C-alpha cells in the first residue's frame, strides 16, 4: 500500500529508511540544513502543480535505464538486492522509472534542495521502504551510504546542473528571464547568495569567477562595472544585474552566443553552490562505492562539468602498470572500462521531445576489478 506523505506525521527519511534498519536522519556536516524532509513541506510544494515532473522531463531516460540495467539485475546468495544511488534526485523522474522497471531495486536519492526532496518523496511514496531520501550534496554520498548501512552499490546516476523545476521557481533567482531576488541557492538554508558575491567580492575575484565558471570573455569588463554600480546602490534583483550585463557586453557580442546574461548567471550559480568542487569530490566517491560489475552514468550540460567527468573517468580506465613494461602487471589492470564511446549526445527525436537535452554529454563506466567486492 502506498504511503500518503502529505498526511504522514513523521519526517520522510525516518519512514523511508525502514529498509536500512541501522540508518537514521542526521544533519550533514557538509550542509548546514542537511537532514530530514518535513512532510508538511510535501503538501505545500506538491499542491502547486499536478505535473509529476514539475516541468523537468527526465533526460535520456531510456538510455540511462539501458546502461544501468546490467548492474541492477543481480541477486546475491544472501538475499540482498541491487542498490542504485540517484545522486541528483530532483523531481524523481529517473528514480521512478528505475523503481518501476526493477521491482526488487533499493534506491537512495540525494538532493540538497528540500523542495525537490518533498516533491520526489510524494512521487516515490508508492514504493515504500525501497526508497531512502537524504538531504545532502552529491559529494555527501559516502556519508549518506554509511548512515543507510550500505557498503557497496550497484549503480549511480548523476544528472548535473540546475533543474527545470528550479528554473521555473522564479523566486529562487536562477533565471535571467524573470525578475527575482538575486539568490541562486540550491539549498535555501545555505548562507552564500549571488547577491553577496556581487555586492561584496572584489573585482579580481569577480573576474576569476566569471572567467573560470562562466567562460565569459568580458569577465573583467563586467566585474569593473559591477563594482562601480554597487558603490551607488547594492544589487538586489536579477533584473538589475541583467540590465548591467546588457550595458557591459558590446552590442556585436550580444547578438551571438545566446542571452548575454547566460554565462554570468551560470558562473554565479556555480560559485554559490560550489558545484564544481562538489563534483570533483563526488565522482571519485561514487566510483569507490561501486562493487565489481557496478555502473556509473553521468550527464553533464556544460564543458566545465564534462571536463571534470572526462578526466576522472580517464584516470580510472587507464592501466596502472608502469609505462614501458611489455605486459600488464597482474593486479594493475584498469579498475573500470567505458561502456559508452566517449560522450553520447541526445538525438534529434530526444531534443524535439525535450529541448533541455540538447547540450547533454552522457558518459558511463563499469567497474571490472579492484576493491569493493
Swiss-Prot record:
It catalyses: cytidine(1402) in 16S rRNA + S-adenosyl-L-methionine = N(4)-methylcytidine(1402) in 16S rRNA + S-adenosyl-L-homocysteine + H(+). GO terms for molecular function: rRNA (cytosine-N4-)-methyltransferase activity. Keywords: Cytoplasm, Methyltransferase, rRNA processing, S-adenosyl-L-methionine, Transferase. Residues 343-355, 363-373 have a biased composition (Basic and acidic residues). It comes from the Bacteria. One of its GO terms (biological process) is rRNA base methylation. Its EC number is 2.1.1.199. Its main location: cytoplasm. InterPro entries: RsmH, SAM-dep_MeTrfase_MraW_recog, SAM-dependent_MTases_sf. The keyword Cytoplasm applies. Residues 343-373 are annotated as: Disordered. One of its GO terms (cellular component) is cytoplasm. S-adenosyl-L-methionine binds at residues 92-94, 111, 138, 159, 166. It is an enzyme of class 2 (transferase). It is found in: Cytoplasm. Specifically methylates the N4 position of cytidine in position 1402 (C1402) of 16S rRNA. Belongs to the methyltransferase superfamily. RsmH family. This is Ribosomal RNA small subunit methyltransferase H.
Amino acid at each position: 500500500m502506498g504511503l500518503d506523505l502529505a498526511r504522514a506525521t513523521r519526517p520522510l527519511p525516518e519512514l523511508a529508511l525502514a529498509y536500512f534498519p541501522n540508518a537514521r536522519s542526521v544533519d550533514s556536516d557538509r550542509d548546514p540544513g542537511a537532514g530530514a524532509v518535513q512532510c508538511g513541506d510535501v503538501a505545500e510544494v506538491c499542491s502547486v502543480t499536478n505535473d509529476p515532473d514539475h516541468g523537468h522531463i527526465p533526460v535520456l531516460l531510456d538510455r540511462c535505464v539501458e546502461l544501468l540495467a546490467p548492474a541492477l539485475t543481480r541477486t546475491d546468495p544472501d538475499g540482498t538486492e541491487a542498490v542504485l544511488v540517484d545522486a541528483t534526485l530532483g523531481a524523481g523522474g529517473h528514480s521512478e522509472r528505475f523503481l518501476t522497471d526493477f521491482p526488487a531495486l533499493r534506491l537512495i536519492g540525494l538532493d540538497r534542495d528540500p523542495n525537490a526532496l518533498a516533491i520526489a518523496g510524494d512521487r516515490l511514496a508508492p514504493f515504500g521502504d525501497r526508497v531512502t531520501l537524504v538531504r545532502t550534496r552529491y559529494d555527501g554520498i559516502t556519508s549518506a551510504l554509511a548512515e543507510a548501512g550500505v557498503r557497496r552499490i550497484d549503480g549511480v546516476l548523476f544528472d548535473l546542473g540546475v533543474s527545470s523545476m528550479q528554473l521555473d521557481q522564479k523566486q529562487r533567482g536562477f533565471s535571467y528571464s524573470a525578475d527575482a531576488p538575486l539568490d541562486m541557492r540550491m539549498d535555501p538554508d545555505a548562507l552564500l547568495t549571488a547577491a553577496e558575491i556581487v555586492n561584496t567580492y572584489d573585482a579580481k575575484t569577480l573576474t576569476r569567477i566569471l572567467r573560470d565558471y562562466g567562460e565569459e570573455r568580458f569577465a573583467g569588463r563586467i566585474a569593473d562595472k559591477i563594482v562601480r554600480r554597487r558603490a551607488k546602490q547594492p544589487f538586489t534583483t536579477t533584473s538589475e544585474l541583467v540590465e548591467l550585463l546588457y550595458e557591459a557586453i558590446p552590442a556585436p557580442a550580444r547578438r551571438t552566443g545566446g542571452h548575454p546574461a547566460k554565462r554570468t548567471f551560470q558562473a554565479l550559480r556555480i560559485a554559490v553552490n560550489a558545484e564544481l568542487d562538489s563534483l570533483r569530490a563526488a565522482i571519485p566517491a561514487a566510483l569507490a562505492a561501486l562493487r565489481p560489475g557496478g555502473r556509473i552514468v553521468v550527464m553533464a550540460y556544460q564543458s566545465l562539468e564534462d571536463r571534470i567527468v572526462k578526466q576522472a573517468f580517464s584516470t580510472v580506465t587507464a592501466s596502472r602498470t608502469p609505462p614501458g613494461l611489455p605486459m600488464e602487471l597482474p593486479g594493475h589492470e584498469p579498475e573500470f572500462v567505458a561502456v559508452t564511446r566517449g560522450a553520447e549526445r541526445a538525438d534529434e527525436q530526444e531534443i524535439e521531445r525535450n529541448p533541455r537535452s540538447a547540450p547533454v554529454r552522457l558518459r558511463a563506466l563499469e567497474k571490472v576489478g579492484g576493491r569493493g567486492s
